Amino acid sequence: MDNIREGVRQKYAFAIANRGQGCCGSPGCCSDGLSDAADPITGNLYDESDLQGLDPELIANSFGCGNPTALMNLNLGEVVLDLGSGSGLDVLLSAKRVGPTGKAYGLDMTDEMLAVAKENQRKSGIENAEFLKGHIEEIPLAAKSIDVIISNCVINLSGDKDKVLKEAYRVLKPQGRFAVSDIVIKRPLPEKIRDNILAWAGCIAGAMTEEEYRGKLSRAGFENISLQVTREYNLEDPSLRGMLEDLTDGEIKEFQGAMVSCFIRAAKPA
């Protein structure tokens, strides 16, 4: 797991330090959340109305695969935690929705991301947000302290997803909600992709099947589990082919249509 974690950390540190060049060293791996012209995973995720008052640079540095703040009706006064908060977009959107009596935490392991997130918070003038350094497998918050957990294309990056989901369950209050966007695969990936760190950092190699996701959430204690497909990816896209270079053309065609983004919802029992 340490090798995966360090590989992911390096890729996203590079992405935020070289904004506009892509997290994998080429254009298209990580682009803004408004236009889908450049990137098959991160493009066209947010409505412009949601982003009013936020710095355009913040929007351009969102590296997710969905809009988890659209998943859940956040209530005034609630406490939200974003696992793998990156440059802070979903944290700041959540903070606006829960109002001054609520709070939004962002957790990230990458110093470069945290620095940018804190600067974005300063520019936005939002006071009810806090960014924490740490790992999503070891959440530095008390048990039963969070109303809603969100995450945006991050859980697939972990080498120990069981631990992530158990930690999420631990920090949620009874009846707390789990609402994330993540990459899901319809069929298992070939082992040669699973061993490719570039494909891990690109949100491909660590993706779970729907059955795996449901099983791990259930074993962690969650109930009312649902997965909703929101986007299907074209593996012929040049941005994805660079991470799938170990596959033959025949294998690409065989796996076509098997990689999707999903909204994943679950709840902690009362």
Swiss-Prot record:
Keyword annotations: Arsenical resistance, Methyltransferase, S-adenosyl-L-methionine, Transferase
Annotated phenotype, changing residue 153 to S: Lack of activity
GO molecular function, one term: arsenite methyltransferase activity
EC class of the enzyme, as a word: transferase
Gene3D superfamilies given in the database record: Vaccinia Virus protein VP39 (3.40.50.150)
Catalytic activity: arsenic triglutathione + [thioredoxin]-dithiol + S-adenosyl-L-methionine + 2 H2O = methylarsonous acid + [thioredoxin]-disulfide + 3 glutathione + S-adenosyl-L-homocysteine + H(+); arsenic triglutathione + 2 [thioredoxin]-dithiol + 2 S-adenosyl-L-methionine + H2O = dimethylarsinous acid + 2 [thioredoxin]-disulfide + 3 glutathione + 2 S-adenosyl-L-homocysteine + 2 H(+); arsenic triglutathione + 3 [thioredoxin]-dithiol + 3 S-adenosyl-L-methionine = trimethylarsine + 3 [thioredoxin]-disulfide + 3 glutathione + 3 S-adenosyl-L-homocysteine + 3 H(+)
Alphabetical GO biological process terms: methylation; response to arsenic-containing substance
InterPro entries referenced in this protein's UniProt entry, alphabetically: Arsenite_MeTrfase-like, Methyltranfer_dom, SAM-dependent_MTases_sf
E.C. numbers: 2.1.1.137
Keyword Metal-binding: no
NCBIfam families from the UniProt entry: PRK11873.1
Family named by the database record: Belongs to the methyltransferase superfamily. Arsenite methyltransferase family.
Function: Catalyzes the transfer of a methyl group from AdoMet to arsenite, producing methylated arsenicals. Involved in the conversion of As(III) to monomethylarsenic and the conversion of monomethylarsenic to dimethylarsenic. Reduces the arsenic toxicity in the cell and may contribute to the global arsenic cycling.
Protein name: Arsenite methyltransferase
Phylogenetic classification of the source organism: Bacteria, Bacillati, Bacillota, Clostridia, Eubacteriales
